[in-house]
Amino acid sequence: MLNVCLTTYPARVANVPRVLDSLRTQTILPDRFVITLCKADERLRHIFDNMPDVEVLIVDDDTKVWKKFLPAMDALHMKHDDLVLTVDDDKLYPPQMIADFMWAHSEFPDAPISGNHYWHNGLKCHCGGCSLVQPRHMAGWQKYYAYWKQLPSDDMFYTMLAARNKFAYMQTATNWERTATPFNEGQPYSVHGMVQQTYLRTAKLFGWI
Protein backbone atom coordinates (compact mmCIF):
# COMPACT_ATOMS: atom_id res chain seq x y z
CA MET A 1 0.00 0.00 0.00
CA LEU A 2 1.26 3.46 -0.90
CA ASN A 3 0.69 5.93 1.94
CA VAL A 4 1.26 9.65 1.47
CA CYS A 5 1.88 11.12 4.92
CA LEU A 6 2.14 14.69 6.13
CA THR A 7 1.53 16.88 9.11
CA THR A 8 0.41 20.47 9.51
CA TYR A 9 -0.37 23.15 12.09
CA PRO A 10 -2.61 26.25 12.28
CA ALA A 11 -0.29 28.62 10.40
CA ARG A 12 -0.15 26.29 7.39
CA VAL A 13 -3.34 24.26 7.42
CA ALA A 14 -4.96 26.55 4.83
CA ASN A 15 -2.36 25.28 2.35
CA VAL A 16 -3.24 21.63 2.74
CA PRO A 17 -6.31 21.39 0.44
CA ARG A 18 -4.20 22.79 -2.41
CA VAL A 19 -1.35 20.43 -1.56
CA LEU A 20 -3.73 17.47 -1.60
CA ASP A 21 -5.24 18.61 -4.90
CA SER A 22 -1.77 18.57 -6.45
CA LEU A 23 -1.33 15.02 -5.17
CA ARG A 24 -4.72 13.88 -6.47
CA THR A 25 -3.62 14.68 -10.02
CA GLN A 26 -0.56 12.42 -9.93
CA THR A 27 0.04 9.96 -12.74
CA ILE A 28 0.25 7.33 -9.98
CA LEU A 29 -2.25 7.82 -7.18
CA PRO A 30 -1.63 6.82 -3.54
CA ASP A 31 -3.90 4.41 -1.72
CA ARG A 32 -4.49 6.93 1.05
CA PHE A 33 -3.39 10.20 2.57
CA VAL A 34 -2.55 10.27 6.27
CA ILE A 35 -2.47 13.61 8.09
CA THR A 36 -1.17 13.64 11.65
CA LEU A 37 -2.15 16.47 14.00
CA CYS A 38 -1.00 17.03 17.55
CA LYS A 39 -3.78 17.09 20.14
CA ALA A 40 -3.47 20.84 20.64
CA ASP A 41 -4.47 21.27 16.98
CA GLU A 42 -7.30 18.72 16.92
CA ARG A 43 -9.77 21.51 16.08
CA LEU A 44 -8.29 21.50 12.56
CA ARG A 45 -9.68 18.03 11.94
CA HIS A 46 -12.98 19.32 10.53
CA ILE A 47 -11.16 20.69 7.47
CA PHE A 48 -10.79 17.11 6.25
CA ASP A 49 -14.27 15.85 7.14
CA ASN A 50 -15.43 15.72 3.51
CA MET A 51 -12.26 14.11 2.18
CA PRO A 52 -12.83 10.33 2.18
CA ASP A 53 -9.32 9.65 0.90
CA VAL A 54 -7.77 11.33 3.99
CA GLU A 55 -7.21 9.60 7.31
CA VAL A 56 -6.53 11.93 10.24
CA LEU A 57 -4.51 10.80 13.25
CA ILE A 58 -4.30 12.71 16.54
CA VAL A 59 -1.19 12.38 18.71
CA ASP A 60 -0.49 13.72 22.18
CA ASP A 61 2.94 15.19 21.56
CA ASP A 62 4.21 17.57 18.90
CA THR A 63 7.26 15.74 17.56
CA LYS A 64 7.72 18.18 14.66
CA VAL A 65 8.95 16.52 11.47
CA TRP A 66 8.64 13.05 12.99
CA LYS A 67 4.87 13.51 13.07
CA LYS A 68 4.88 13.13 9.30
CA PHE A 69 5.29 9.40 9.40
CA LEU A 70 6.14 7.66 12.68
CA PRO A 71 2.63 7.86 14.21
CA ALA A 72 1.09 6.62 10.97
CA MET A 73 3.48 3.69 10.73
CA ASP A 74 2.58 2.67 14.27
CA ALA A 75 -1.16 3.35 14.34
CA LEU A 76 -1.89 1.85 10.93
CA HIS A 77 0.25 -1.26 11.52
CA MET A 78 2.20 -0.89 8.32
CA LYS A 79 4.02 -3.92 7.00
CA HIS A 80 7.27 -4.46 5.14
CA ASP A 81 5.67 -4.10 1.72
CA ASP A 82 3.94 -0.83 2.62
CA LEU A 83 5.40 2.34 1.16
CA VAL A 84 5.50 5.65 3.01
CA LEU A 85 5.93 8.84 1.02
CA THR A 86 6.30 11.96 3.15
CA VAL A 87 5.35 15.34 1.73
CA ASP A 88 5.31 18.92 2.99
CA ASP A 89 2.28 21.05 3.79
CA ASP A 90 3.55 24.05 1.80
CA LYS A 91 4.52 22.49 -1.54
CA LEU A 92 2.54 21.96 -4.75
CA TYR A 93 3.76 18.80 -6.45
CA PRO A 94 4.00 18.16 -10.21
CA PRO A 95 1.97 15.26 -11.66
CA GLN A 96 4.98 12.96 -12.15
CA MET A 97 6.37 13.28 -8.61
CA ILE A 98 5.01 10.01 -7.19
CA ALA A 99 5.90 8.18 -10.41
CA ASP A 100 9.49 9.42 -10.11
CA PHE A 101 9.72 8.16 -6.54
CA MET A 102 8.24 4.81 -7.56
CA TRP A 103 10.78 4.53 -10.36
CA ALA A 104 13.63 5.25 -7.94
CA HIS A 105 12.17 2.69 -5.54
CA SER A 106 12.10 0.07 -8.29
CA GLU A 107 15.78 0.76 -9.02
CA PHE A 108 16.80 0.62 -5.34
CA PRO A 109 14.07 -1.40 -3.59
CA ASP A 110 15.91 -1.74 -0.27
CA ALA A 111 17.00 1.88 0.06
CA PRO A 112 15.30 4.85 1.69
CA ILE A 113 14.93 7.49 -1.02
CA SER A 114 15.00 11.23 -0.56
CA GLY A 115 14.06 14.04 -2.88
CA ASN A 116 16.52 16.90 -2.85
CA HIS A 117 16.57 20.61 -3.58
CA TYR A 118 18.23 23.14 -5.81
CA TRP A 119 18.90 26.86 -5.39
CA HIS A 120 17.45 29.19 -8.04
CA ASN A 121 17.25 33.01 -8.00
CA GLY A 122 17.64 33.14 -4.23
CA LEU A 123 14.87 30.64 -3.52
CA LYS A 124 15.12 27.06 -2.31
CA CYS A 125 13.26 24.84 -4.76
CA HIS A 126 12.49 21.12 -4.79
CA CYS A 127 13.68 18.87 -7.56
CA GLY A 128 11.11 17.59 -10.03
CA GLY A 129 9.37 20.93 -10.43
CA CYS A 130 7.29 21.26 -7.27
CA SER A 131 6.78 24.77 -5.94
CA LEU A 132 6.20 26.49 -2.65
CA VAL A 133 2.66 27.58 -1.93
CA GLN A 134 4.21 30.84 -0.72
CA PRO A 135 7.76 31.32 -2.14
CA ARG A 136 10.22 32.47 0.48
CA HIS A 137 13.93 33.03 0.90
CA MET A 138 15.67 30.26 2.83
CA ALA A 139 18.82 31.88 4.21
CA GLY A 140 21.17 29.38 5.78
CA TRP A 141 19.62 26.42 3.95
CA GLN A 142 23.01 24.74 3.50
CA LYS A 143 23.18 23.63 7.13
CA TYR A 144 20.18 21.33 6.67
CA TYR A 145 22.03 19.32 4.02
CA ALA A 146 25.47 19.20 5.58
CA TYR A 147 24.80 15.65 6.75
CA TRP A 148 25.09 14.37 3.16
CA LYS A 149 28.83 15.05 3.35
CA GLN A 150 29.10 12.93 6.50
CA LEU A 151 27.86 9.74 4.87
CA PRO A 152 30.41 7.25 3.50
CA SER A 153 30.78 7.82 -0.23
CA ASP A 154 30.35 4.13 -1.05
CA ASP A 155 26.88 4.24 0.53
CA MET A 156 25.60 6.90 -1.82
CA PHE A 157 24.10 6.66 -5.27
CA TYR A 158 23.23 9.66 -7.41
CA THR A 159 20.65 8.66 -9.98
CA MET A 160 19.44 11.07 -12.62
CA LEU A 161 15.70 11.20 -12.94
CA ALA A 162 13.83 12.44 -15.98
CA ALA A 163 15.74 14.52 -18.51
CA ARG A 164 12.77 16.88 -18.54
CA ASN A 165 14.21 18.62 -15.47
CA LYS A 166 17.96 19.07 -15.43
CA PHE A 167 17.89 19.91 -11.71
CA ALA A 168 16.08 16.71 -10.74
CA TYR A 169 17.88 13.85 -9.06
CA MET A 170 17.35 11.39 -6.27
CA GLN A 171 19.76 10.45 -3.52
CA THR A 172 19.61 6.99 -2.02
CA ALA A 173 21.73 5.31 0.61
CA THR A 174 21.78 1.53 0.69
CA ASN A 175 23.41 1.23 4.09
CA TRP A 176 21.75 3.92 6.17
CA GLU A 177 20.38 1.28 8.49
CA ARG A 178 23.96 0.20 9.19
CA THR A 179 25.30 3.72 9.78
CA ALA A 180 22.20 4.98 11.59
CA THR A 181 22.49 6.38 15.09
CA PRO A 182 19.71 5.71 17.61
CA PHE A 183 16.86 8.21 17.68
CA ASN A 184 16.61 10.24 20.86
CA GLU A 185 14.96 13.47 21.91
CA GLY A 186 18.28 15.27 21.77
CA GLN A 187 18.55 14.63 18.03
CA PRO A 188 14.97 14.92 16.75
CA TYR A 189 16.08 15.86 13.25
CA SER A 190 18.73 13.18 12.79
CA VAL A 191 18.20 11.67 9.36
CA HIS A 192 20.23 8.65 10.43
CA GLY A 193 17.92 8.15 13.40
CA MET A 194 14.85 8.69 11.26
CA VAL A 195 15.90 5.96 8.87
CA GLN A 196 16.75 3.60 11.70
CA GLN A 197 13.32 4.12 13.25
CA THR A 198 11.76 3.43 9.86
CA TYR A 199 13.64 0.17 9.47
CA LEU A 200 12.61 -0.89 12.96
CA ARG A 201 9.00 -0.47 11.84
CA THR A 202 9.73 -2.42 8.63
CA ALA A 203 7.73 -0.24 6.23
CA LYS A 204 9.75 1.42 3.49
CA LEU A 205 10.18 5.19 3.56
CA PHE A 206 10.72 7.73 0.89
CA GLY A 207 9.97 11.41 0.78
CA TRP A 208 11.10 14.98 1.07
CA ILE A 209 13.65 15.65 3.78
Regions found by a protein language model. Name each.
Residues 36-81:
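Active-site-proximal specificity loops/subdomain of glycosyltransferases
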Residues 80-92:
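Short beta-strand-to-loop acidic/aromatic patch adjacent to the donor-nucleotide binding site
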